[in-house]
């Protein structure tokens, strides 16, 4: 009887599985070479992140993390690298709020190290100094996004009610 209860408890939990991780798109540009190689190296990094999700089938989702890095050196673009790191994930038995968190925080945190490696590799191949992106707290970004949505919804509600 104990075994049956444990089995039922396990079935109530969300199940998560990585099916595949892959690069969907990769772009590398060095618009100001070779002049940028002659300058004193004083890089300024701009990092942009975006996540998109697509439901492919029942309980199967594609999550694409787009990471765009632009490095400026003395007010000129040294290089720009954009990678769309994707993954296909199976998620079963998750409540709506849990599913949203998995798709917009947990999955991107799985994809980011792969994107970071792809960016670092392209930068080195371009003969620039190694670029190591710091880890990103996707949970904090997700919570910030939820708060912004709640504030926007609250503002709409206030506008409608007045």
Curated annotation (Swiss-Prot):
A GO cellular component annotation in the UniProt record: cytoplasm
InterPro entries on file: SecB, SecB-like_sf
Q: What GO molecular functions are on record for this protein?
A: unfolded protein binding
* Native source organism of the sequence: Legionella pneumophila (strain Corby)
Which residues are in coiled coils? Answer: none
Q: Which PANTHER family match?
A: PROTEIN-EXPORT PROTEIN SECB, PTHR36918
Q: Which gene carries the instructions for this protein? A: secB
Q: What is its main location?
A: cytoplasm
Entry protein name = Protein-export protein SecB
